[in-house]
Amino acid sequence: LNQSVLICDQVSPILKEVLEKNGLKVTYEPEVTPEQIAEKIGNFEVVVVRSRTKITRELIEKADKCKIIARVGVGLDNIDQNAAKEKNIRVLNAVEGAITAVAELVIGLMLSMAREIPRADREIRNGNWIKKELMGTELKGKYLGIVGLGNIGKRLGRLARALNMNIIGYDVTEIDEEFSKEVGLMKADLDTLLSSADYVSFHVPLLDSTRHMINADKLKLMKKTARIINTARGGVIDEDALYNSLKDGNLAGAALDVFEVEPATGNRLTTLPNFVATPHMGAQTKEAQLLAANVIAEKIIQVLRGVL
């Protein structure tokens, strides 16, 4: 496999090791700029990114030798897939890597809201012991609506079932029957799910059909005691509509790991007391990054060998 690989973002060292063991020449430049990529992309058969680097049509047009663009992660919205397809470039991702990490983060975010953990921590640091004000709720017996029942959605369903939550599911494709029986899934359309659930978690890609799928009208369907979690992609929820719902008390809480504009350090949602934010860290565990790197290395090798 005497071919060259450009790794543009910080990834687990195992990726470079595995590729080099298989005879590939690897250039690791985790801080490379778009301008630098434009200058050198024409020299590589494989380009690897994570979240930071955007592989645009302009870059792809310069990628004359490129056979593969690989993302060490799940979502592919930082790669122009249409441009890649036009040049017969394979686009790979590592959905397997993030399954457990993202599902566990959702559980953490639900517990953070249910027990007001971020607020409790802040108040103690500020010298306030507000035990009596922090009357939480339990997850046991609550209804969790899962929008999108792929690998991550199903993993979340199993974890939530172990906490004795009731699972409502919606997906545009057929839902796995075995999984449905395992967790006692109640299938519903989106509107029914939104109006019934105490917590709603999103696990869908960002497409034209999912952009702002949660807008002001959809939020009005939800109970005032309900809480929303998004670890999928920022554009799935209309953040202005979400801000108004939280501010006006029409929704009890929200937790977002992903935002329409990232970094989201100046986002006005972060001024609200009933909002929890994390910095797009769903797949940011040692285990997930190691697994994703191994998965991508294996896929790259298989494609170059003509096996995949």
Region roles according to the model:
Residues K87, V91-L92, E177, T225-L308:
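Rossmann-like dinucleotide-binding domain for NAD(H)/NADP(H)
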Residues K87-I89, A94-Y143, R158, A162, ...:
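Phosphate-binding beta-alpha-beta segment of Rossmann-like dinucleotide-binding domains, i.e.
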Residues K21, K132-K224:
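Rossmann-like dinucleotide/phosphate-binding beta-alpha-beta segment
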Residues K54, G75-N78, G97-A98, Y143, ...:
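Residue-level detector of alpha-helix initiation sites
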Residues E45-V46, I68, Y199, R227, ...:
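Short, Asp-centered acidic motifs that coordinate Mg2+ and/or phosphate
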